[in-house]
């Protein structure tokens, strides 16, 4: 699975998908390294089991009590998990959580497909609306532009002024579209980069937790370190859930855009409506998506409590708030100035 999202352009999309796939391949290729830690973990767990069993047996003998065998099975159960860590532990967790990932990915794919269909319908209706208006038809159609030029052939000064004005207006329209497309492409790159950053951090965390997992299980055998086992499990599940949370966030953005595009289509179906061709709403959602991707770790932490991730979540949220404020202010100022000048 890859971290996909609905707010994405066609150019360069394949490159980003390849990078996400590289991260998936990296996780798979790094899993054999778990075996290198198994031997060390066995030694740690064996030493811990020796102290654990000896302590429990000595306490029972000192108190002249019967030896309770059931608690003594804990080190052996953990040792069994260490011996078959990739299969019993990682395989079980990934198998249980995989349907969640697939379910959220299907939700996102369905919403994105509906949004893309509505977007194509909106673009077609917008073009038809501009073609219906004689004052804007020549801006989007070369045939209409050539037709108006042919109607004003001659040396009439009035026609020359009109033709010059048409060329200038068409040039400004094309310049406006080009600048809007360039600004959208820039935001799309930032959006893709945000998704790639989250995916890279997620993959790194999963690899570290997977490779060093046997060591964590071995340490958990010792008295006083029992919480290491539950801490490792909660952190692994929390990081693993970053992907379905990301898909749910993308699904929400796609649904909101679907509703917005639906309203635009309803307005464009009115013959009296004249579209302005601006992409302000799209740009706003791009900015929301860029900042929103960095709160995914916090939301995943709400699903399952992972105490050790608190500092990371706090730091990354503070960093995002600062950088988001600066980036949002800069992008808003630039976008506002550009769109303001173009509308004039």
PLM regions and their residue ranges:
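N-terminal amphipathic/basic-hydrophobic helices that include classical n-h-c signal peptides
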Residues: 1-13
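Histidine (H) residue identity feature
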Residues: 5-6, 20, 159, 312
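Hydrophobic alpha-helical segments involved in membrane association or supramolecular assembly
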Residues: 11-121, 169, 173-337
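Membrane-interface interhelical loops and short interface/amphipathic helices
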Residues: 99-170
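Short, charged juxtamembrane terminal tails flanking transmembrane helices
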Residues: 339-344
């Amino acid at each position: 699975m890859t971290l996909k999202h609905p707010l994405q352009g066609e150019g360069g999309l394949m490159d980003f998908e390849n990078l996400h796939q590289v991260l998936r391949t990296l996780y798979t290729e790094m899993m054999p390294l778990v075996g290198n830690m198994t031997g060390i973990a066995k030694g740690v767990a064996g030493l811990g089991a020796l102290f654990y069993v000896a302590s429990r047996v000595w306490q029972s003998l000192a108190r002249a009590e019967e030896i309770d065998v059931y608690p003594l099975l804990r080190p052996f159960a953990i040792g069994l998990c260490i011996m078959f860590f990739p299969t019993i532990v990682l395989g079980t967790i990934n198998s249980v959580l995989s349907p969640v990932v697939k379910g959220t990915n299907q939700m996102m794919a369905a919403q994105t497909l509906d949004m893309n269909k509505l977007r194509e319908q909106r673009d077609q209706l917008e073009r038809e609306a501009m073609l219906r208006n004689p004052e804007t038809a020549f801006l989007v159609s070369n045939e209409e532009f050539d037709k108006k030029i042919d109607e004003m052939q001659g040396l009439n000064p009035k026609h020359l002024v009109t033709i010059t004005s048409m060329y200038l207006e068409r040039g400004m329209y094309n310049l406006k579209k080009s600048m809007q497309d360039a600004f959208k492409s820039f935001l799309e790159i930032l959006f893709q980069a945000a998704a790639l950053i989250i995916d890279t951090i997620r993959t790194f965390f999963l690899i570290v937790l997977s490779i060093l997992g046997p060591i964590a299980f071995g340490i958990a055998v010792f008295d006083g370190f029992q919480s290491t086992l539950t801490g490792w499990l909660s952190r692994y599940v929390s990081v693993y859930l970053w992907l379905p949370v990301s898909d749910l966030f993308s699904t929400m953005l796609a649904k909101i855009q679907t509703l917005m595009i639906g309203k635009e289509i309803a307005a464009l179906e009115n013959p009296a409506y004249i579209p302005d061709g601006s992409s302000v709403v799209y740009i706003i959602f791009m900015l929301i998506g860029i900042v929103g991707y960095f709160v995914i770790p916090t939301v995943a932490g709400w699903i399952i409590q992972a105490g050790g991730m608190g500092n990371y979540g706090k730091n990354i949220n503070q960093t995002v708030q600062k950088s988001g404020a600066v980036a949002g202010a800069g992008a808003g100022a630039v976008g506002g100035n550009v769109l303001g000048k173009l509308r004039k």
